[in-house]
């Protein structure tokens, strides 16, 4: 690159300090069709929070993500329109030739620097590498790419490179979606070794109100829900392999105990194989099921299902921090009990009726404890690490044979989730659905309603199942010494 262009770049950088952003109000007032929103997320959305509404024991809050943080300076109407046209229509991992060329040039100019910042001498300000690349693309092509889109594009290219390398070694490797498999097929060798933990805690829920309460959800159209969930890109640098969650290779994160040589018959090995319950010293999750029941035929279709089995692998919680609100990290760092944090990777079955009006979307869940208390369950749907909606439910104990059960059957799923599922189905292509689900998570926090003692925290990630039945793998989240901050 000649010196003249470098000089032009340095002069223009100070003028590009504001990322193009769109406020939540703008998004809700006018959203593109569902087939466009995959690439129309914008960082730095100036979030507006709707007032919290309460009724009985249930609370629902709809609050758009806070955006890109201090680096964003709000939205400018002329650039917002330009940005939408700039960012729409790109396939996953595919940018136009001019943008990709500028992207490659910027990669060469700005070498990887980890979480460190690069100082622009003329400005005296510090910038992350991805932000500088985004600014360079804007200067070079006049088209907007946010720093998070740059981060995502880098990761997409890295995953493609990995798949190409694997294909050369192993031949034709089926795609991620073709090998999405039940929990038994998720196990893989370890690249990061953590000591196994004997006891485990977990819990799971969908966004679902208690059956005795009415659902309180703001009136939001389906396209608005889609746009609500896609305003920015996550910061990930993990590689994708078949059948593993949220575009990540869990084999890079988990420890799997080496199993002895199988010298016994399959029947005997099944008998001696030890399974771990999803439980802690205070609370046990026995089962969870989110389902759709047709009122006309009484046919019940399971969307998500968890059984009382914990995987033997442990995963570093820090790699998931940016998938969830900051509350997750705060809870983990402050909690004296580190055994109450879990990840549930769910392969969901969305082959359900499109007749939403004549179908019941509901949740069944069953917990137990040897202690008597009331459970408070806070469940948040999150998009790109930011809370979108929250629901709070109450579970009351039922004493039986010296223990206490917490049962909630036929609890209606909230309108937000019903509309999200309907909108997701419109994408038709499973791979596209999974790309969407990479940025959608659910966080459940279970506490003692009287003392606020933390009992369980479960982080949900989702993928569309290729099988007719849903499945799930639950892992313990531990402190692996990592840090996902940029």
Curated annotation (Swiss-Prot):
UniProt keyword annotations, A-Z: Cell cycle, Developmental protein, Differentiation, DNA-binding, Neurogenesis, Nucleus, Transcription, Transcription regulation
Effect listed in the UniProt record for changing residue 140 to Q: In n998, n1087 and cas6; two-fold reduction in mRNA levels. Production of an extra neuron from the Q lineage and a mild egg-laying defect
Keyword presence, DNA-binding: yes
GO MF term set: DNA-binding transcription factor activity, RNA polymerase II-specific; RNA polymerase II cis-regulatory region sequence-specific DNA binding; RNA polymerase II-specific DNA-binding transcription factor binding; transcription coactivator binding
Superkingdom of the source species: Eukaryota
Function: Transcription factor. Binds to DNA sequence motif 5'-CATNNNNAAATGCAT-3' as a heterodimer with egl-46. Represses expression of genes involved in differentiation of touch receptor neurons (TRN), probably acting as a heterodimer with egl-46, perhaps by occupying similar cis-regulatory elements as an unc-86/mec-3 heterodimer. Plays a role in cell fate specification of neurons, including the hook neuron HOB, and touch receptor neurons.
Descriptive protein name: Transcription enhancer factor-like protein egl-44
Organism the protein comes from: Caenorhabditis elegans
């Amino acid at each position: 690159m000649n010196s003249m262009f470098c000089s032009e770049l340095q002069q223009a950088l100070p003028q590009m300090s504001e990322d193009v952003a769109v406020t939540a109000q703008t998004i809700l007032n006018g959203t593109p069709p569902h087939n466009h929103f995959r690439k129309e997320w914008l960082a730095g959305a100036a979030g507006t929070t709707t007032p919290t509404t309460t009724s009985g024991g249930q609370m629902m809050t709809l609050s758009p993500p806070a955006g890109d943080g201090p680096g964003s300076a709000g939205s400018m109407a002329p650039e917002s329109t330009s940005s939408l046209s700039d960012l729409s229509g790109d396939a996953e991992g595919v940018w136009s030739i001019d943008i990709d060329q500028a992207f490659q040039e910027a990669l060469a100019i700005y070498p990887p620097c980890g979480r460190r910042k690069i100082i622009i001498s003329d400005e005296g300000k510090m910038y992350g590498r991805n932000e500088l690349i985004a600014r360079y693309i804007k200067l070079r092509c006049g088209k907007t790419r946010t720093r998070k889109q740059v981060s995502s594009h880098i990761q997409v290219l890295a995953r493609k490179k990995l798949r190409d390398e694997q294909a050369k070694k192993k031949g034709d490797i089926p795609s991620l979606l073709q090998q999405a498999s039940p929990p038994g097929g998720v196990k893989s060798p370890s690249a990061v070794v953590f000591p196994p933990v004997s006891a485990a805690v977990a819990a799971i829920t969908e966004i679902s109100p208690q059956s005795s309460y009415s659902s309180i959800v703001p009136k939001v159209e389906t396209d608005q829900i889609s746009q609500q969930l896609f305003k920015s890109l996550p910061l990930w640098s993990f590689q994708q392999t078949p059948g593993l969650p949220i575009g990540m290779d869990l084999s890079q994160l988990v420890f799997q105990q080496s199993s002895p040589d199988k010298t016994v018959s399959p029947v005997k090995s099944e008998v001696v194989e030890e399974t771990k319950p999803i439980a802690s010293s205070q609370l046990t999750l026995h089962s969870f099921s989110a389902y759709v029941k047709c009122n006309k035929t009484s046919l019940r279709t399971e969307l998500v299902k968890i059984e009382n089995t914990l995987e033997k692998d442990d995963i570093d919680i820090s790699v998931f921090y940016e998938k969830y609100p900051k509350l997750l990290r705060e809870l983990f760092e402050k909690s004296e009990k580190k055994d109450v944090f879990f990840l549930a990777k769910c392969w969901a079955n969305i082959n359900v009726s499109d007749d939403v009006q004549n179908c019941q979307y509901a949740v069944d869940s069953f917990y137990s404890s040897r202690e008597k208390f009331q459970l408070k369950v806070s469940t948040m749907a999150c998009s790109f690490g930011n809370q979108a909606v929250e629901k709070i439910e109450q579970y009351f104990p039922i004493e039986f044979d010296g223990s206490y059960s917490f049962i909630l059957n036929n609890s209606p799923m909230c309108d937000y989730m019903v509309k999200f599922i309907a909108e997701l189905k419109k994408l038709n292509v499973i791979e596209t659905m999974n790309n969407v689900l990479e940025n959608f998570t659910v966080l459940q926090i279970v506490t003692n309603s009287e003392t606020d003692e933390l009992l369980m925290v479960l982080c949900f990630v989702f993928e569309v199942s290729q099988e007719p039945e849903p499945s799930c793998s639950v892992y313990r989240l531990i402190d692996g010494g990592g840090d996902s901050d940029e």
